[in-house]
């Protein structure tokens, strides 16, 4: 196979290698066989999940910063986010400040968790000149409709007696007025690009509370209470902003965080991989490639539902470029990916092994597999 340019666009291999390491290892394998005759372009990828911040940091030249914010139960914690100050870009993961994994199982109760810490991260980004904020909203512990985040940015929520409310899920039902007088004015110049891979509306049986409440600690009684409270909150949003966001796909994401971002800010909700495509200038970089190599830790039937390898493959097929996937393992029904642009898929596991051995030897196994593939291609 005549190869002049190869684009290597993998996701991370969970718990063993980040996407950059995967890309470097594949390049090393091909260089061992082809020498320096090929132009390589390594583009670390992610689909909005783990590794997204790293992929975007690589693309923008961003640096990670750590600040003190409040966790979902309003306790001080350290949380990190990334900034590329020269590009006025910030990359924030909601889970860093308001994530479910920050709470013990017995602490998880969406009646009392708040997204305030996410607002504090946004405020710190504003303090350093951010004009574009890329926000990943997966893995949240909250069902407060983004009111905690809004509070941290200056919005005031008051009850029927004019008393200021400290916002969490339970207090949504007590909102009488939303006052945006003190909302940080810098937000008028900010664009939010939100990595959101769910289409749930804000309310109802397919909405934020019913679908995601249980994993955040809500029982059925709590779910009914929270959904009613969320409906009341949405009525107040309409009065305050003139916008009805309930039926916008993704408004229910992250316990209603999507609704708050859509209602109050210049926001687009986009699939995580599409944000990575945009920031990395992916389409421009692949269109003259002779081969695209992608991969992920485990490829199976779920891969066809928006995961990185299929996203990369579908993009490559727009330019009629062949696509090879190299993965940590190939799971049940992985062959479905062949209907979505991937021409051939390989596992790096060559013999029965323990999980510990697989993770420990993943780099060498990847090098071996990629070398074998390079040898086959050179025969053609």
Q: What do the PLM-derived regions correspond to, one by one?
A:
Residues 2-137, 141-380:
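N-terminal loops that bind phosphate or other acidic moieties
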